[in-house]
UniProtKB/Swiss-Prot annotation:
Single GO biological process annotation from the record: protein secretion by the type III secretion system
Entry function: Component of the type III secretion system (T3SS), also called injectisome, which is used to inject bacterial effector proteins into eukaryotic host cells. Acts as a regulator of the YscN/SctN ATPase activity. Overexpression of YscL/SctL abolishes type III secretion and down-regulates the expression of secretion apparatus components.
Gene transcribed to yield this protein: sctL
Pfam families: FliH
UniProt source species: Yersinia enterocolitica
Induction (free text): At 37 degrees Celsius in the absence of calcium.
GO cellular component annotations of the record: cytosol
Record-given protein name: Type 3 secretion system stator protein
Length: 223
């Protein structure tokens, strides 16, 4: 007991002193009264309760931290998904605008090239070729009137016989001038209807075909 008294630890109760592993009687005391013992137990309970409270506070704090961490991560992911969806939508719009622009450019380039090639041909020969192709569509008709540009009408009349001989089914073939038509213009009138075989009309049909093809390609890529 004397060794215990010499350690110099601070007292918690008048009859005990703190030892790392247990409680011991204070110096000079040999008898532990019941009320003092009960007081000691109460103190130990308070210390234990305080430790438990501290541990619970730490646990709660850790739980709150994890919750906030998870909420922050989820909020970040939600924001990233929203940004991703926005970027995808903007990219799709840009692609559509690009396709439309390229479609227009390609159509213009092709048509310009076709017109340039056609301009290198003799206009009368080209008109006769157009008439030939148009007559092939109405070769089962007996009477056909061919309307052409007034500047070409005389020359076409002189040479139409070379074309007519390839279509003996057509018994009557007349060439007439039409001021509404440009060089290369050609309209065929028959008993069943009218056919516009003009060069400009064929180029316009080519333009529509190019636009349709490019549009179908764009739809296929989007799917």
């Amino acid at each position: 007991m004397s060794q215990t008294c010499q350690t110099g630890y601070a007292y918690m109760q008048p009859f005990v002193q703190i030892i790392p592993s247990n409680l011991s009687l204070a110096c000079g005391l040999r008898i532990l009264r019941a009320e003092d013992y009960q007081s000691s137990l109460t103190t130990e309970e308070l210390i234990s309760a305080a430790k438990q409270d501290a541990e619970k506070i730490l646990a709660d704090a850790q739980e709150v931290y994890e919750q906030q961490k998870q909420l922050g991560w989820q909020a970040g992911m939600d924001e990233a998904r929203t940004l991703q969806a926005t970027l995808i939508h903007e990219t799709q719009l840009q692609c559509q605008q690009f396709y439309r622009h390229v479609e227009q450019q390609m159509s213009e380039v092709v048509l310009l090239a076709v017109r340039k090639i056609l301009n290198d041909y003799d206009q009368v020969d080209m008109t006769l070729q157009v008439v030939r192709e148009a007559l092939a569509l109405v070769s089962n008709q007996k009477q056909v009137v061919v309307r052409v540009n007034p500047d070409q009408a005389g020359t076409i009349r002189e040479q139409i016989a070379k074309v007519h001989k390839d279509f003996p089914e057509i018994s009557y073939l007349e060439v007439t001038a039409d001021a509404r038509l440009d060089q290369g213009g050609c309209i065929l009138e028959t008993e069943v209807g009218i056919i516009d075989a003009s060069i400009d009309g064929q180029i316009e049909a080519l333009s529509r075909a190019i636009s349709t093809t490019l549009g179908q390609m764009k739809v296929t890529e989007e799917e």
